[in-house]
């Protein structure tokens, strides 16, 4: 789910989650 969509530009399973967070 996009629980990290507030601070990230990707899904929680996408690499963007680690980079964007």
UniProtKB/Swiss-Prot annotation:
What keywords would UniProt list here?
Answer: Lipid transport, Lipid-binding, Secreted, Transport
Molecular-function GO term, any one: lipid binding
Top-level division of the source organism's lineage: Eukaryota
Tissue spec. comment: Expressed in hemolymph.
| Assigned GO CC terms | extracellular space
Q: Which GO terms describe its biological process?
A: lipid transport
Q: Does the keyword Methyltransferase apply?
A: no
The function of this protein is:
Constitutes the major component of lipophorin, which mediates transport for various types of lipids in hemolymph. Acts by forming lipoprotein particles that bind lipoproteins and lipids.
Please state what the protein is called.
Apolipophorin 2
Which organism is the protein's source?
Galleria mellonella (Greater wax moth)
Query: Taxonomic lineage per UniProt?
Result: Eukaryota, Metazoa, Ecdysozoa, Arthropoda, Hexapoda
């Amino acid at each position: 789910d996009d629980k990290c969509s507030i601070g990230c530009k990707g899904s929680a399973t996408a690499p963007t989650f680690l980079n964007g967070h």
